[in-house]
Amino acid sequence: MNYQKRLASVGVFLATLLLMCGGWAQAQSKGSSGNASFTVTAVSKKEAPPAISKDDVQLSFGKERKQIADWKKGDKLFLAILIDDSLDSTAAGQWQYLKEFIMAQPPSTMIAVGYLRNNTTMVAQDFTDNHELAAKALRIPMGLGAIGSSPYLSMIDMLKRWPSGAQSPNARQSILLISSGIDYFRGGGFGPFYPDLDPLIQRAQRQNTNIWSVYYPSAGHRGRSFFLLNNAQTNIDKLSEDTGAESYFLGSGMPVSLKPYFDEIGQHLNNQYLLTVAGGGGSKGKYQSVKVKTEAPDVELIAPAAIYLPKSGE
């Protein structure tokens, strides 16, 4: 009898060990696959683009055509609404439209609200699926009291603190930036692009985060400088384009309404796909320029300028 009990115990132990080894092997296979997933947005001249299948999509690494390992409609979204605290206080008059945008998001969208100040992101509301709670975090920007900061360094800070649960192959990440784009911390004199722009773009690409930017002027006379504004809009336009999103501005004046911008961004977020490609990043990992096209009529695909291919074993 004791022998049978010992035999049964050994059997349970071996079965448990096999399950653990199988799970470990599966995890190793997944980690060493070298797959990279990134978000692609379908844009149509019509009100809503048609469903896009994997067969409709062409992916290239430079001039080399690549096979798409997986293509699926985006579901889970982590969306951070980041407001430059140096904005003119009249921006708060647009928050009714921003609240409508927040409340229109599907239940699967986790929303955070933060204010960019002192080269960091002051999180007013962490990621939550309670959209009413997120909407309540909106307040009047500080204006002149926040002049002297860099929205680019502030967003890098936010990306460094992005929740690990959001950085999965099955989740999308987006930032909705409302800013003049002016870097008051670094100032001018660095050529057309601010020194922290490229590090921000690379971090966003590595974390598969699209950065949608909406222009609103800063407080004070310095924020009306033609040179600063022209340079800033060049920077935020590149930021959005290189991270697979779009920038919204019409000249350098005070926008009448931000509602059309929020509505369009909402439509884009509802028409996103996750594209997975198998590609080795070598022993160190690397950034790879990509081009994504479709043969579907009247449809354009928006994708980041480059993606990060993880190193073997990541």
Q: What label would you give each PLM region?
A:
Residues 1-6:
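N-terminal secretory signal peptides that target proteins for export/translocation
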Residues 7-11, 56:
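Detector for intrinsically disordered, low-structure N-terminal pre-sequences
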